[in-house]
Amino acid sequence: MAGHSKWANIKHKKAKEDAKRGKIFTKLIREITVAARLGGGDKDANPRLRAAIATALANNMSKDTIERAIVKGAGGDESANVEEVRYEGYGPGGVAIIVDCMTDNRNRTVGEVRHAFTKSGGNLGTDGSVAYMFTKRGIISFAPGVDEDALMEVALEAGAEDIITHEDGSIDVYTDPHDFSDIQEVLIEKGFNSENAEVTFDAETKAELDTETAEKVMALIDKLEDLDYVQSVYSNANFTQELIEQIG
């Protein structure tokens, strides 16, 4: 299937990733640790841990670092005080936003998340206010230049739900979240190394934005992602290649 240009959407403002690399690794390690604490250190018996490991590997985390996080989680440690919290709300232009957190202080967290929404012209909503607009799925993204036919054959045989080829040649492989890590492993074994891979909440309908609104939404997402206890931020904003180039 053909789709709109998505390459720049994989992670908006891609150039900022290097500066945020340490923070990204911290969030990935936290997810691995909590997944191991809740479901045990055996990835074959713990789908959440398996998915967390696949995402970490896609972000070039070393196997030694991953193993240390698993051992830490499986052994208990300070992660026992961390709880998972989800917040939902609306950003500028009515964009739907989901914020997943891991925190040891729920009151502090909700206060700072609410502040970020309010300062950006949005508002924090109630549980379920926007979640119905999203579907949880795995997305494995490849840069332009990959052999589309070969990738499609391997991905579909491995159990992928859909494959989208975008106008710029980038490709997204969509999976059931439970099959995400297995399909990712098969693709790696066959020589297909992704640019990004994660289990995410994908919006069924995207919100189209003008340049000014898109810039405000990006700023809000950046504020939320910069909070230490925020693990992931999802939105239904359609950050097109054109918008990102205009914003710079």
From Swiss-Prot:
Its subcellular locations are: Cytoplasm
Any one GO MF term held by the record is:
DNA binding
Q: Which UniProt keywords apply?
A: Cytoplasm, DNA-binding, Transcription, Transcription regulation
- Name the residues that span the membrane: none
Main localization is cytoplasm
Q: So which domain of life are we looking at? A: Bacteria
**CC per GO annotation:** cytosol
Any Pfam family from its record, for instance, is Transcrip_reg
What InterPro entries does the annotation carry? Integrase-like_N (IPR017856), TACO1_YebC-like_2nd/3rd_dom (IPR048300), TACO1_YebC_N (IPR049083), Transcrip_reg_TACO1-like (IPR002876), Transcrip_reg_TACO1-like_dom3 (IPR026564), YebC-like (IPR029072)
Which cystines does this chain contain?
A: none
Any Gene Ontology biological process: regulation of DNA-templated transcription
NCBIfam families under this entry?
PRK00110.1, PRK12378.1, YebC/PmpR family DNA-binding transcriptional regulator
* Protein family: Belongs to the TACO1 family.
What protein is this chain from? Probable transcriptional regulatory protein FTL_0929
